[in-house]
From Swiss-Prot:
This is Chaperone protein FimB/FhaD. Residues 1-24 form the signal peptide. SUPFAM superfamilies: PapD-like, Periplasmic chaperone C-domain. One of its GO terms (cellular component) is outer membrane-bounded periplasmic space. Belongs to the periplasmic pilus chaperone family. It comes from Bordetella pertussis (strain Tohama I / ATCC BAA-589 / NCTC 13251). The gene is fimB. GO terms for biological process: cell wall organization; chaperone-mediated protein folding. The lineage of its organism: Bacteria, Pseudomonadati, Pseudomonadota, Betaproteobacteria, Burkholderiales.
Amino acid sequence: MARWRRRLGVAALGAAMLASLAPAARASLVITGTRVIYNAGSPETTVKMSNEGQAPALMQAWIDDGNAEAKPDEVQVPFFLTPPLARVDPGKGQTLRIFFNGYPDGKTLPSDRESVFWLNVLEVPPKATPEEGHGVLQLTIRSRLKLFYRPKGLSGNPLTAAADLTFKRKPNGVLEVHNPTPYYVNLQKLEVGENGAHGSKTPWMLAPLSSDELRLKGTGAKSVQYWAIDDFGGVTPYQAAIAD
C-alpha cells in the first residue's frame, strides 16, 4: 500500500489529490488489509477503516486504472463506491462499499485473467485551531491499494500462484520471469544469488499470462529467492532454479 502526502493550504480538496510521491506521514485513518479482491459475480466488496487519531478526519475515496495523477472525475473505471466522501470521528470506523457496474461504453474486462485497478483513500486533517496558529503544517495523506478484479472459473489457486513462476537465463544477460497463471503475482522482493549479488528487485508485480525481465550482474547464479504477498497480505518465501 503506497502513501502520499502534501502541504494543505487554501486550495480545494480536489487540488490536494494531485499530491506528489513522498515519504509516508503517520495516518490517522487505518485501512484493514493491503489489497482488495473483487470476485466476479459478487454483489459488492467492502473495505473497512478506522480513525485511530485524536481528531476528526475527512476521507475521500475513488478508484483509478493505474494513472495516479488522474483526477477522480477524469477516470473511467467499471466500479463505483460509496461513500466517496465522509467524516470519520476519532475512535470510529467507516466502511467503503465497492460495486462492479461495467464500463459506460460497454467495454468488457478479460475473462481469462485478473485485471488490476487502484483504490485511493485521501485523508485530510482538520483545520488548525486558533491556538495552533495559521503557520501550522498540515498534511494530506493518500493511500493507494491494489484492487484486483477476479473473473469466475480461473484455473489454479491464487494463494499459491507464486510457486508456478519460472525463471530462464537469456543469452543477453537477462533473467526472464514468466507467470503462467491467470493471477497477478506480487513480490515483496526477488534476489538472484546470495543477498541479491546477481540482481534484485523490490517490489515487483508480475502480470498474469506474461513475462518480464531483470538485468543480471554476472552469470554464476543458479537460483532465485523471492517473497510473495498473498490476498491477505501474508508473505511466503520461495526458491526456484534458473533454467538455461
